[in-house]
Amino acid sequence: MGCVQCKDKEATKLTEERDGSLNQSSGFRYGTDPTPQHYPSFGVTSIPNYNNFHAAGGQGLTVFGGVSSSSHTGTLRTRGGTGVTLFVALYDYEARTEDDLSFHKGEKFQILNSSEGDWWEARSLTTGETGYIPSNYVAPVDSIQAEEWYFGKLGRKDAERQLLSFGNPRGTFLIRESETTKGAYSLSIRDWDDMKGDHVKHYKIRKLDNGGYYITTRAQFETLQQLVQHYSERAAGLCCRLVVPCHKGMPRLTDLSVKTKDVWEIPRESLQLIKRLGNGQFGEVWMGTWNGNTKVAIKTLKPGTMSPESFLEEAQIMKKLKHDKLVQLYAVVSEEPIYIVTEYMNKGSLLDFLKDGEGRALKLPNLVDMAAQVAAGMAYIERMNYIHRDLRSANILVGNGLICKIADFGLARLIEDNEYTARQGAKFPIKWTAPEAALYGRFTIKSDVWSFGILLTELVTKGRVPYPGMNNREVLEQVERGYRMPCPQDCPISLHELMIHCWKKDPEERPTFEYLQGFLEDYFTATEPQYQPGENL
C-alpha cells in the first residue's frame, strides 16, 4: 500500500551505520540534527515552522475576518482565499487558570497569537471559546507531528528507554528525526529474541530528492504515513512488523501558566502544602498544589538559610535552564520563609529510591542508564556554563519509568549557614566534594565531575555512604594524599576506571560531561551496530 516503486530484483542489505557509537579517545557523542523544512506562506503575520512548532514563538498570528473552516484539508479559508492552518489537540488538557482553555484530544483550533512562546492564544472550533493553550499539546492538522507514532527530536537512547518501558509488546515502534542526517528520520522498533531478550532496533528512513521516503530503495513511499502502513501489514525485511505506536506520555510544561511564564513570583496563598516528603538540614520538601489544581513539589527553606535577594537573583538564571533531565523550576515565594516550586517527581530522591524503594532490585544496566541520564542533564549544565556545586544522589529525583532529573542546581552557593560555608563544617558534603573545592573554594564544572564519580559509587552500592568507615576529616586528608575508593563489589572494572578518571587530581584531566554521557549511554552497546541493515531489504 502506498508503494511508489517496488523493484523485483532482490534488494541488497542496508549498510550498517555506527551513528553515535562510542569513541573514547575523542569523547565524541552525536548531537541533534535539526531538519529545517519550508512551508508556503499562508498570508498571516507568522505561522510556526511545523517541524519545530513546539519551540515556535516570538511573532504574533494575525487572522483575518470572515473565516470558514475545512476539516478535511486542515485549513481555514479567509475572504481573500488565503489558508490558515488548523491545529489539533494531541492530548486532553484541563485549564489551570481563567486564561487557559480546557480541551480534549482531537479538538481543533485556530491559532490567534503565538507570541507567548510556549503558550498560544487559540480559538476552539468545537466550543468557540478563546484562551491560551500549551503549544506542545497541539500539532498542525494532517501533519506528521499529529501522528501517534511521531516523536520528533527524540534521541536514540531516549527512544530505547520509552520503547522498553514495561507493558510494550514486540513491534511497538516510533519514528523520530535523524540525529545525523538532515531530512531523514529513524524508525525504532521494540524486538525480542532468545539471545538478547527485549531490545530495540533502529532503521534509517531516507528521503528521496522528489520528496518520497524509503528504508530500502526497493520500496519507496510518497509519505511517512504510507511507509508506516506498509510495514504495519508485513515485516518485509524489518525485525518484525509494526504493531502499535509507542505511548508518548504527557508533555512537560515549563511554566505553571501563561501568567507565571514571566511573572513567576507567586503569592504564598496560591500554594497548599499537602504531604511532607522529606526533611533536610535547611528545610523541608512537600508535595502540594498550586491554585488547588496543579500538583507541584514545594521546597521550604528555614529562615536565614540564604538571602532572599541573592536567591531571587540566582532563581532568574535557574528559571532559564530548561532540559528534560533537570527538575523544572516553576515559581518562587521570595519572602522568608522562601518557597521553591518545581515539578513533582513521584518516586522521591535517588538516594531513598536506592536504599528503601524499588531501586534495591535494580540490575547494572538500569543503574548505568540512570547514571547516563544524570550525565545528560549535567552535559546541558556544562554547555550552559553553569555549575551545580552539590551533585549527589540526594539531589537527583526519580519519576516513573526510572526517569532521573537533577534538582537543587546552583543553590549551594547561596547557603549562609556557618556550618556549611566553612566547607569543612558538619553540614558540608565533604565526601562528594572535589579537594580543590573543599580546600580552596574552587567550584567549577570539573569539581561537579568529581562529584559525579562519587555519585556513581552510590548507584552501584545502592546508596551506601561514600568512604565507609571514614569521617570527613579523614576523607579530606586521605584524598589529598592520593587515596581513591577501591572498586565496589560487583562493579565492572571499566566502570571503576571511569570513576578514577573523574577523580583525577588535576581538574583539567577529568572528562567532560559530554564524554561521560556518551560513554554511559553506549556502555552496553558500543560493540554493536546501532542501525540495522535489515533482512532481505
Curated annotation (Swiss-Prot):
It is an enzyme of class 2 (transferase). InterPro entries: Fyn/Yrk_SH2, Fyn/Yrk_SH3, Kinase-like_dom_sf, Non-receptor_tyrosine_kinases, Prot_kinase_dom, Protein_kinase_ATP_BS, Ser-Thr/Tyr_kinase_cat_dom, SH2. Its EC number is 2.7.10.2. GO terms for biological process: activated T cell proliferation; adaptive immune response; cell differentiation; cell surface receptor protein tyrosine kinase signaling pathway; cellular response to amyloid-beta; cellular response to platelet-derived growth factor stimulus; cellular response to transforming growth factor beta stimulus; dendrite morphogenesis. The modification Phosphothreonine is found at residue 12. Its cofactor is Mn(2+). GO terms for molecular function: alpha-tubulin binding; ATP binding; disordered domain specific binding; ephrin receptor binding; G protein-coupled receptor binding; growth factor receptor binding; identical protein binding; metal ion binding. Pfam families: PK_Tyr_Ser-Thr, SH2, SH3_1. Residues 271-524 form the Protein kinase domain. GO terms for cellular component: actin filament; cytosol; dendrite; endosome; glial cell projection; membrane raft; nucleus; perikaryon. Residues 149-246 form the SH2 domain. This is Tyrosine-protein kinase Fyn. It comes from Sus scrofa (Pig).
